[in-house]
Amino acid sequence: MSRALLRGAACQGCRHEVLRSFVSVSGIPMPRSSPLSSRSISNSRAFSAVTVLRSDRPPSSNQIDRHLSESQEPPAHSEANTPASSQHVPWYLQEEAPIVKDRPLTEAHLPQIPDDSPEMLSTLLEYTYKDLGLDHLKLFDLRGLEIPAALGANVIMIIGTARSVKHLNVSADRLCRWLRSQYKLSPYADGLLGRNELKIKLRRKAKRARAASAAGAMVDEKDDGITTGWICVNAGMVDKGATTTQLSDVGIEGFGNLDLGTSVVVQIFTEEKRADVDLDGLWEATLAREGRKDIRESTEDLSKTGAGPPRSTSDGFGSIPGQKRGFHTMRRLALSAMNSAEPGLEAGFPGVGASSSALPGDAAEVASQLTPTSLLQILAELPADSARNELGSGPNDRQSTLFLRLFYTNHAARFSAQEKAIFRLKLFSIAVSRQHPAYTKDTLFSTFSDFLRDGYDLPDDLGFDVVSALLTPRTAGVVTEQSETHSSEADMELALLVLDRLSLRGVPILNMRIFNILYQAVCAPKTAPSKPTESRPEEGSPSWSVVQQTESQKQTLSRLSKILAAANIPFDAVDARQLMVTLFQCGDYDGFWRLWRQFPLKGVNRTQEDYVQLFKLHAELGEEVRARECLSTGVPLMNQESPAIVLQGPIVTAIMHCILVADPTLQDRDEESPSFYMPLWTECQEALAREN
């Protein structure tokens, strides 16, 4: 029996314990074995892997005697005094100490929690770092900003990086389960595939790979539909005590309630996808722009508070943004008070003088028939210097010039508050676009914000006029201290804010007019008004505006050209003609010809004015290669138009100028070596002779 027991005990420790059990029954004290030496520890194994032949060999008596002799006998009273609780516990009954797997947590690993945050935000940050193992955590407080509607309102965004695609999916799944179990929330993970769905997609992917390998084809693995490296976990509203208000209480028409709590969104990326998307840079720039806007508005409020006594709003067109308004009892200025301006009517405002010849009566009758719309149209058609003179000293000036007196007093009572706000916004747009030093772009943007805040319906053309005015550069002739501190980056930020608000109101901002404005804003520093005759046809040299492009401007123009070619922009014939000229002046000749070819594809006929513009632009450019391309392409197309373009009028001179650029030696050649363009030149001369 003892042999069978010893055969079952494979390891040395088990054999020793079996031997002790028999010896203790016989009454012979047997000391416990001493701790194993370093040699026995090095040869020990956690799990027995002894072969069957070795386990069948019984232990020799010499081994047992050696263990008994090597053990030192302790005193007899120590064996008796040892309590039962201190007896030896076998290794298979010993409790292992728990292994701490928590990541070291310091303040540098977790972002700073903003004020008035939900209580669970700190716990969520610790869980995402310690339990999920996300790195490079960042927190963005987007409450109060205009963000995409899919994320909700009052959003706090957390961005983290996963170590791999598998870690990405596991972390998102665990986070959703944790939010459901701990806080009873209903999170939604956009981009996370379920376990069964993932198996199905992997099975289909393997099937496609086998079919492709059998056919000898390659499988495009760029976008397999399994993972994008980016999962957005939207936890929804996390404030348990969030207040609820009626929509009508916050000025929104409709029915239902509005939750004013805080939403939490966790964006989980792989390292490559996070660097590619650069969501951190997007929101950092947005928060920085919003901070500069708050500082600018607070500075304006302080400056306007102590600017002087508030004026009356008796003219009905409101006041500058930030000015206090109150009730008044002042009488509206009558037209009879303007009779003293009759002698200077034509001299001070030439547009009115031109209209007075067709209108009966004196200057008062002329002024009475001028509406604010017609006055603004006349102001927009004036030269820049004359327009700046008519606008007076600034937004506070309403009496210094005849235009201001007519604009602020004529028919003010006949228009609604919305029409008056539209007239005022148009006036500020024209003033900024005409580069008046007193009308700043910040004031224009504040007027635009007040217009939207009042709930007025903004016409699309007026919104685009505001964007164009904000992108107008400051020329050297009218630079002031205010304009010097106003950088082009700040102008672009204001213009993008206007476009964002227009987009939120449902205005289609991807159109040819916007691209025309953007191209003009990029190319504007290269066209100065001090050089009115910079590129004439007889110069025969490229336009200096194209040559002086910097590297940053070339990169911006290249990006605009790619967007214009890829985007599906609605075609508008009027805006397309203006955009073609702008593209050519900015050096985007491929974009010019691409837009030129779209006219017949969109069912629009090209007119004689279009061909005159075509030949004139290439003649002013002064490049022989492009002039030859223009002649070889444009002249045959004239006969294919419906109706055909006849060779008469201004198009004849435009073609002749283009021929001189394509072949400057045409008139110096003899009859033996005539020019290729000589037949066309002769035809143009005959057309000129017929007209004379």
UniProtKB/Swiss-Prot annotation:
InterPro entries: Atp25 (IPR040152), NT_sf (IPR043519). It is a peripheral membrane protein. GO terms for biological process: mitochondrial gene expression; mRNA stabilization. Residues 1-48 form a transit peptide. Residues 293-303 have a biased composition (Basic and acidic residues). GO terms for cellular component: mitochondrial inner membrane. Keywords: Membrane, Mitochondrion, Mitochondrion inner membrane, Transit peptide. The keyword Nucleotide-binding does not apply. It is found in: Mitochondrion inner membrane. Residues 52-86, 293-322, 528-548 are annotated as: Disordered. The keyword Magnesium does not apply. It holds the Pfam family RsfS. Its main location: mitochondrion. Belongs to the ATP25 family. Probable mitochondrial mRNA stabilization factor. This is ATPase synthesis protein 25, mitochondrial. It comes from Penicillium rubens (strain ATCC 28089 / DSM 1075 / NRRL 1951 / Wisconsin 54-1255). The lineage of its organism: Eukaryota, Fungi, Dikarya, Ascomycota, Pezizomycotina. The gene is atp25.
